[in-house]
C-alpha cells in the first residue's frame, strides 16, 4: 500500500460514517420531497403492489419505478424510520464515491490520489446536501456516474471487445437511469459523449457503439414499460408530456429560473473546494491532447450544465450528476498543485472557506439579534440554535486554516470543513421553519388526536403525505388545494378524495356524525385561519401550521 494511503482510507471511512450515516435518523423529514417518497414506498410495501405508484391512495405517475424500489428496500430493511427513508440516497451516493475511486484508480493507478478523489466528492456541499436527502437525484446521479465511468473505460480500451463491453455497461447504466427518472438518463450521456467523439474524430465508431448501448437500454426497460402500460394505459402520456416536455421546455414549465441559475449553485455546491474550481476546469481543457480522460470529464461537467441551463424548469438538484466528474478534475488539479508546491491555490481556497464561514456566522447573529427585523428568523428563546450554528461554522474556519498549506496532503483536509454542519444542521434550523417544512414534530405532538379522528384532511400535499407517513394511513383527504395530486384526483374511482372550500361545511356537518374530523392547515406567514371555516372544538397552532379538531356529534344534533 502507498505511504499514507491507509490514513486516508481511515479518514474517508470516518467522514462517510459521520457525515452520511450518523445524522440520518435525527433529522426530521422535509416536506414535500422526503415525505412524498417515504409515503409512496410505504404504500407500495403495505399493498404489495410494486408496479403502479400511488400517493395517498391515488395514482402517481411522475417518475418510473426503480427509484421507488430502492426506497422500498430501505424501508424493508430498516422499517418506518427516517434513516430508512434516506438510506437509498446515501447508498447511491456511497456507490457514486466508489465509482469516483474506480475511475481515478483506472486512470492514474495511485491509491492515495483515488481515495482523495472519493473524499473530495463526498465533501462537496451539493453532494452531501442532496446525498443525505430523500429524493431520486442521488439515484439517477449514480447511474449517470456509472455511464461516465463506462465512457472512460471505453476511451481507454485498446481492444474492440473491451470497448464493446464498456459501451454495453454504459447502455445498462442508461437503462437503469431511465427506470429511475426517465429520459434524462438518455439525454445527458448523449450530449456528454458527443464532443469527445468529435474532438478525437471517433464519431462513426461512437455512433455504432452508441446504437448498441441504446439497444441494451431499451431491452432493460421493455418488460416493466409494457407491464405498466397494460396496467395503467395513461401512464406514458402523463410521464412523457407533462413530466418531460412541460417541466423542461414549455413556457409554463415548473420551477422556472434564468439561464445563469446554475452558476451560483455550482459555486456554492463546490464548497469547500471553490478555490480549485477555475483551475481544475482550465486544466481539463489544457490536457485534452495528452490526457483525453480529463477532457472527457470536463465534457461530463460542462455539457449537462449547459443542457440544464437552457431548460426552462430548474432545480438545484438537477446538476448533481456533474459533481462526480468535477471531483475527479478537482482531485487531479489539487495533486498537481501540491506536487509543484503551488501553495497560492490552497491559500485562495482556504480564504474562500474562511470568508464563507465568517459570513455564515454574521448571518446567524443578525438572524437572531433583531437588528434587522425583516431578516429575523429566530425567536428570543432560540439562542442555543444560534450558538450551535456559530460552533458549526467555527469548525469550518478551523479546517480551512489547517488546509492552507500544500505540505503533504494537508490541503485535502478542507474536506472536513462541512463535517460539523452535517452532524448538527438539524439543531440550527429555526422553529418556525421546522413547523412549516418539517411537520413531523407537530404531528407527533398531536398524534393521539389525529389517530382518533375518523377523517384527516390537509390543504397541502406535503403536509398530507407527512400525516400519512406518521399515521400509517393513505386515506388523508385533500382540502381546497390539489397540488401535484390533481392528475390522480381526476380518476372516477377516487371521487370524494378532495373537498373544496364551499363543499367542506356541508360535508363536515354530515361526516362528523360518524366520528372526529381533523383538518391540518399549512398557512402563509402571519396568515389567519381561512374565512368561512366552521368553528372547531379545538385549535392548535404553531407558526404556519394549525390543527382544527372537530369532535364527533351525536346523531340527535344532526
From Swiss-Prot:
Family matches, as InterPro entries: ArnT_tfrase, Glyco_trans_39/83, LipidA_mod_glycosyltrf_83
A GO CC term attached to the entry: plasma membrane
Homology family: Belongs to the glycosyltransferase 83 family.
Key words, A-Z: Cell inner membrane, Cell membrane, Glycosyltransferase, Lipid A biosynthesis, Lipid biosynthesis, Lipid metabolism, Lipopolysaccharide biosynthesis, Membrane, Transferase, Transmembrane, Transmembrane helix
Catalysed reaction, written as an equation: 4-amino-4-deoxy-alpha-L-arabinopyranosyl di-trans,octa-cis-undecaprenyl phosphate + lipid IVA = lipid IIA + di-trans,octa-cis-undecaprenyl phosphate
Lineage, opening ranks: Bacteria, Pseudomonadati, Pseudomonadota, Gammaproteobacteria, Enterobacterales
Membrane association type: Multi-pass membrane protein
GO molecular function: 4-amino-4-deoxy-L-arabinose transferase activity; mannosyltransferase activity
Cellular location(s): Cell inner membrane
Pathway(s) of this molecule: Lipopolysaccharide metabolism; 4-amino-4-deoxy-beta-L-arabinose-lipid A biosynthesis
Pfam family name, one: PMT
GO biological process, one term: lipopolysaccharide biosynthetic process
Name listed for the protein in its UniProt record: Undecaprenyl phosphate-alpha-4-amino-4-deoxy-L-arabinose arabinosyl transferase 1
EC numbers on record: 2.4.2.43
Biological role stated in the UniProt entry: Catalyzes the transfer of the L-Ara4N moiety of the glycolipid undecaprenyl phosphate-alpha-L-Ara4N to lipid A. The modified arabinose is attached to lipid A and is required for resistance to polymyxin and cationic antimicrobial peptides.
Spans through the membrane: 4-24, 87-107, 115-135, 136-156, 178-198, 207-227, 257-277, 295-315, 316-336, 355-375, 383-403, 411-431
Encoding gene (name): arnT1
Amino acid at each position: 500500500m502507498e505511504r499514507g494511503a491507509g490514513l486516508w482510507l481511515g479518514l474517508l471511512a470516518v467522514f462517510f460514517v459521520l457525515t452520511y450515516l450518523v445524522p440520518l435518523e435525527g433529522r426530521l423529514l422535509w416536506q414535500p420531497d422526503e415525505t412524498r417518497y417515504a409515503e409512496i414506498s410505504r404504500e407500495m410495501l403495505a399493498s404489495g403492489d410494486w408496479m403502479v405508484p400511488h400517493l395517498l391512495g391515488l395514482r402517481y405517475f411522475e417518475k418510473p419505478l426503480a427509484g421507488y424500489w430502492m426506497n422500498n428496500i430501505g424501508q424493508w430493511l430498516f422499517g418506518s424510520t427516517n434513516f430508512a427513508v434516506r438510506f437509498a440516497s446515501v447508498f447511491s451516493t456511497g456507490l457514486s464515491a466508489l465509482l469516483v475511486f474506480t475511475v481515478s484508480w483506472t486512470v492514474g493507478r495511485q491509491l492515495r490520489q483515488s481515495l482523495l478523489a472519493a473524499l473530495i466528492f463526498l465533501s462537496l456541499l451539493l453532494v452531501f446536501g442532496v446525498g443525505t436527502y430523500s429524493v431520486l437525484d442521488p439515484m439517477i446521479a449514480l447511474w449517470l456516474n456509472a455511464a461516465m465511468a463506462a465512457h472512460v473505460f471505453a476511451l481507454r480500451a485498446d481492444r474492440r471487445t473491451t470497448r464493446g463491453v464498456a459501451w454495453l455497461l454504459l447502455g445498462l447504466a442508461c437503462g437503469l437511469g431511465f427506470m429511475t427518472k426517465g429520459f434524462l438518463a438518455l439525454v445527458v450521456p448523449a450530449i456528454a459523449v458527443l464532443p469527445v467523439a468529435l474532438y478525437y474524430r471517433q464519431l462513426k465508431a461512437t455512433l455504432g457503439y452508441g446504437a448498441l448501448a441504446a439497444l441494451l437500454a431499451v431491452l432493460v426497460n421493455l418488460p416493466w414499460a409494457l407491464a405498466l402500460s397494460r396496467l395503467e394505459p395513461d401512464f406514458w402520456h402523463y410521464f412523457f408530456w407533462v413530466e418531460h416536455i412541460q417541466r423542461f421546455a414549455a413556457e409554463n414549465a415548473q420551477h422556472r429560473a434564468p439561464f445563469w441559475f446554475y452558476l451560483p449553485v455550482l459555486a456554492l455546491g463546490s464548497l469547500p473546494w471553490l478555490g480549485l474550481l477555475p483551475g481544475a476546469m482550465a486544466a481539463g481543457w489544457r490536457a485534452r491532447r495528452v490526457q483525453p480522460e480529463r477532457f472527457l470529464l470536463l465534457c461530463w461537467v460542462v455539457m449537462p450544465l449547459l443542457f440544464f441551463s437552457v431548460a426552462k424548469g430548474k432545480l438545484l438538484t438537477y446538476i448533481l450528476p456533474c459533481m462526480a466528474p468535477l471531483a475527479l478534475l478537482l482531485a487531479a488539479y489539487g495533486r498537481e498543485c501540491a506536487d509543484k508546491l503551488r501553495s497560492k491555490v490552497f491559500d485562495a481556497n482556504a480564504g474562500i472557506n474562511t470568508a464563507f464561514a465568517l459570513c455564515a456566522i454574521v448571518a446567524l447573529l443578525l438572524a437572531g439579534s433583531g437588528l434587522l427585523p425583516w431578516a429575523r428568523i429566530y425567536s428570543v428563546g432560540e439562542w442555543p440554535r444560534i450558538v450551535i450554528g456559530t460552533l458549526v461554522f467555527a469548525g469550518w474556519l478551523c479546517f480551512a486554516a489547517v488546509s492552507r498549506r500544500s505540505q503533504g496532503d494537508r490541503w485535502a483536509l478542507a474536506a472536513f470543513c462541512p463535517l460539523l454542519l452535517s452532524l448538527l444542521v438539524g439543531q440550527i434550523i429555526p422553529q418556525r421553519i421546522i413547523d412549516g417544512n418539517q411537520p413531523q414534530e407537530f404531528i407527533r405532538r398531536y398524534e393521539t388526536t389525529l389517530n382518533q379522528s375518523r377523517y384527516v384532511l390537509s390543504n397541502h400535499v406535503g403536509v398530507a403525505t407527512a400525516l400519512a407517513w406518521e399515521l400509517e394511513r393513505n386515506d388523508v383527504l385533500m382540502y381546497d388545494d390539489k397540488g401535484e395530486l390533481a392528475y390522480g384526483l381526476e380518476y372516477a374511482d377516487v371521487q370524494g378524495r378532495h373537498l373544496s372550500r364551499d363543499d367542506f361545511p356541508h360535508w363536515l356537518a354530515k361526516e362528523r356524525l360518524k366520528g372526529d374530523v381533523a383538518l391540518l392547515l399549512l398557512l402563509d406567514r402571519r396568515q389567519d385561519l381561512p374565512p368561512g371555516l366552521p368553528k372547531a372544538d379545538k385549535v392548535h397552532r404553531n407558526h404556519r401550521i394549525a390543527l382544527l379538531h372537530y369532535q364527533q356529534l351525536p346523531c340527535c344534533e344532526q
